[in-house]
């Protein structure tokens, strides 16, 4: 068989581990040929690819980013390019395409699958917001990076008697904020799923100083927002791909809390450091398993599906189910965190 692989959307620790796994399973165990499209869907639409053999994937298991490159393609461009993509699949003699990506990539994969292209998806996102899989690779690395940063920030916050508002990634879901906040022993966490009351947040932070503590750490997912009418808040806008472009929750909260508490408050934005660098052992293993099972699904002809972790097993689930909704932080999980913050 001849299999095409691509990585699309934001980069993520573990992408190279998937690519490596696909090549090893397909080439060594099945005698397949694998090609990689450069820069995601753009590479498929422009027929820009390279051959992936064992030499090409040597030494990439622990490397962050993606050796294939990635890009974002506006949805309308992909819709208009379905026939071009089909033509390139036929021209290259591909039996399957394995796209590796998050919500946007999986929606694009479903579009192509619905139009008859042989697609087997692999989910990736540091946000951990794909509903049909227990975990996505990249999440563990992002939480580890954020937790290490929070551990370090505690000492400088205490030295200067400051409130630090640490902004982590999470447009629509607060999984990184929740897990890193719990792991680092933060003093408050705000997430997109639960609009916060600025009065309650101020009181919670203020209680620490009233009790004689010298600092406070607030972890804020980038998509967190206050309850309507409780504080002046700039919600930002949208980029050309339709994604929300936020105006900075950490910056806005630092101004508000400093005015209310009379304590110096500083924003800290972790940003893309959460997406870069070496994946954790957990993410390497999960990504490798996803790649292995994606190749097996191709050989079984299970198209229109993607890999998913269910318990300790890797299962195949439909792309339609995968993109139906996001996996958000439930109230019960937030309540668990609240009792220890």
Swiss-Prot record:
The lineage's top-level taxon is Bacteria
According to its UniProt record, the EC number is: 2.7.1.11
Q: Catalytic activity annotated for this protein? A: beta-D-fructose 6-phosphate + ATP = beta-D-fructose 1,6-bisphosphate + ADP + H(+)
Tell me yes or no: is Transferase among this UniProt entry's keywords: yes
What sort of enzyme, by top EC class, is this? transferase
Where does the protein end up? Cytoplasm
Active-site positions on this chain: 127 (proton acceptor)
Q: Which pathway does this polypeptide act in?
A: Carbohydrate degradation; glycolysis; D-glyceraldehyde 3-phosphate and glycerone phosphate from D-glucose: step 3/4
Q: Which GO terms describe its biological process?
A: canonical glycolysis; fructose 1,6-bisphosphate metabolic process; fructose 6-phosphate metabolic process
Pinpoint the site Important for substrate specificity: 104
Cofactor(s), by name = Mg(2+)
UniProt GO cellular component terms: 6-phosphofructokinase complex
**Residues involved in ATP binding:** 10, 72-73, 102-105
Recorded GO MF terms: 6-phosphofructokinase activity; ATP binding; diphosphate-fructose-6-phosphate 1-phosphotransferase activity; fructose-6-phosphate binding; metal ion binding
Q: What happens when the gene is disrupted?
A: No effect.
Keyword annotations from UniProtKB, A to Z: ATP-binding, Cytoplasm, Glycolysis, Kinase, Magnesium, Metal-binding, Nucleotide-binding, Transferase
Q: Which residues bind Mg(2+)?
A: 103
Principal place of residence: cytoplasm
Recorded hits in InterPro entries, A to Z, give:
ATP_PFK, ATP_PFK_prok-type, Phosphofructokinase_CS, Phosphofructokinase_dom, Phosphofructokinase_III, PKF_sf
Belongs to which family?
A: Belongs to the phosphofructokinase type A (PFKA) family. Mixed-substrate PFK group III subfamily.
Q: State the oligomer form and interacting partners.
A: Homodimer or homotetramer.
Q: What does this protein do, in the record's words? A: Catalyzes the phosphorylation of D-fructose 6-phosphate to fructose 1,6-bisphosphate by ATP, the first committing step of glycolysis.
Q: What is this protein called?
A: ATP-dependent 6-phosphofructokinase 3
User: What organism is this sequence from?
Assistant: Streptomyces coelicolor (strain ATCC BAA-471 / A3(2) / M145)
